[in-house]
Every structure is written in C-alpha cells, then in structure tokens.
Amino acid sequence: MNSDKFYANLPVLENFVDITNGENFYPVPQDWAVIITDIADSTKAIETGKYKDVNLLGACSIIVILNLVGELEIPFVFGGDGASILIPPKFIPDAERALLAVQKMASEEFNLNLRIGIVPLEAIASNYDIRIAKLRISDNYTQAILRGGGISYATTLVKDKSTNSLYSPKLNHQYAIADFSGLECRWQDIPTRHEEILSLIVQVTAPSQTQIDNLYREVINQIDHIYGKGTECHPVVTENLQLAFQRKSLLSETRVFAAFQGRIKQTLYLWKLRLINLLGLVFMTFNIKTGSFNWGDYKQIVSEATDFKKFDDVLRMVISGKTKQRHKLTDYLEKKFQEGRLVYGFHVSDRALMTCLVFERDGRQVHFVDGADGGYALAAKQMKELMKS
C-alpha cells in the first residue's frame, strides 16, 4: 500500500493543548525516513554574529525538500539551527542530492558546516518510535507535532561521530541544483511589543507516558496563565512588521539565490529585493488589490502563519512578554527541575527574527520565528548544561 499521503490524510487538531493527548497521534509508516539537519558548532557561529545565516540555512533544508515533493504534504519542524523532516522512501535519492547541494552552498557561501543525515524509520523502531499529529495554526498552515522519542534519537545518530557516517549522504561530484523557490528573508528583525522575547525549550523527564502528557499539559497551561492566551504573547504582531531595505538584512537571502554567481550578480539580486520590498510597502500601505488579494491583509496573514509554538519531542516556544513574567515561569520550571520532572533552557532577546516559506501570498505559507542573537540554539545549549548538572 502506498504510504505517500499518510500525513496529508491525518485529521487536524484545533487546540495546542491537544498535543498532550496520546490518542491524537499516529505512527509514521515504517518505510519512511527522517531527515535531520543542523549547523555544527552553531554556538560559535552565533558568537560571530551569524545567527540569521544559521536560521536561514535551517529553513533552506526544509524548502528544498518541500519543492522536491511538490504538492505532497509532508511533516517538518524548524529547530532554529536545523530541521526535522519526514519523507516517503521514493524521495530519498533526490533528497540526498538536494541536501548535499545545500551543504555545499552553506560551506562555500556562508562558511558554515550544515550537518545532514537521513535515518530510516527501521533504524529507530527497535529503540523508539515516531508518532505524529497535525495542528492547525492558520487557514494557510498546519504544523506537524512529533513525539515518541524517535526524532531525538535520530538527531543523536546524526550528530554522534561514531554513527554519523551511517546516515550521511555520500559525497559525490554531481550536485543537484537545489530549488529554493519560496524562501524569503525580507523582514526587519521584529522588536518585542512588551519587554523581551523569550525562546524556550522544555523537555519532560517523567517515567511514564501518562505522567509526561500530564506535565506537558500543566506546563502549557502555566504558560497560558502567566503570559495570556491568544495573541497576547505572540512575538509577531502586524504593527511591528517592517520590510527590510538595508543590505545586512537582505544579504542572507541574496547569498542563497545568487550563490556562486559573483559579486555583480549578488548586487543585482540585492537591488531586486529592495525594489520588490518597495512595491510591497506601497501595496500594503494603500491596500492595493492584485486579483482578489488585498495586500493590506498580508501582515495579518504572516502573523497568523508563524510557528511560534511547536513540539518535536520537546516543547519549543518563542514568547513576547515582560521580565517579571519570565521570572514567574522560570521559578515554576526550576521547581519542576529540582523535583526531577523536567529540564529546560531559555534565551532572552529584545527582538525576534523570521525566515519565510511562501508558496502563495494568499495561501500556503509558513513563517519560522526565533529569538534574535541565539534563540533556540542557545536555549538548547543551556538545557544540555542543565542536564549535566
């Protein structure tokens, strides 16, 4: 039986807290594979001011696979400095070639090492599993929710030097030309509308699945109680969305689409982006319509299709809030940590950054959001240090 449409046919959850109910999850077909990508030594890259590049390359690994599978719906989660993607078996050879092309571009254009691995489900099944649900974020975006420990295990296999070679695509000299169509990085960093942007990662360590579900539900409810439900803590609000025109803000996208083409081509692409953004600014300001689409609605569409809360064996959230709210939350999390029930990490910034995958202006799109200057990557580093303590 062909399993290609497994994910497309899943029922859609409407409430984030429903991810804590195991009955809402379905096992991924055993003939599928997990793609894991991440930037090696991402902390060093962040220290040298390259976190926007780190974010962009994580998104690149997603967009090339989405373009490869076309209209087929597949699950993916953006992790800040990398991504987790699940694909049917027939796409694996082409996925290897596309990811190697991204890896080459990351090395030669950005001087960053994109680590990539493709792990068959059968390599995970003897130790863990991957169960999946689908959550509606907006009319234009449904988000994959992954649990079962399999994603974390696959990540370990790809990162561990003793097993990495088993799952890394083999280098060759016939790189495909990766298709980055739909990738955009055209917004200014987004200032918090409160006092700070909190990038948070929480991993529950309770002994049973029921206890794990209950504690994740408690954590989510606690965050809602402290920060408010709905849009109150949303890091991307329309009034703070501003298109970028400065070179440094547009350079990352320019280096992707004009890779290996020399400085003149990069300069031309940069000015092309400025012109596109100028037109976008005019269209949005004056509510200009193209066909049935009103550009005055676009910022709201962007805000609604952001992935600011998600789950892939760990809870990840980017939250806009006040310092006293963070202290209240971290006091709660620290208490649970001292009880041996969870580990957590966080990073604080004054703004968020966003990388976009846009297939239709008034349709299918997702906007990956992270805290600036380290975000999820530094939150993960802090969590790892806490696990060692």
PLM features per residue range, with description:
Residues M1-S389:
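Regulatory and interdomain segments flanking nucleotide-handling catalytic cores
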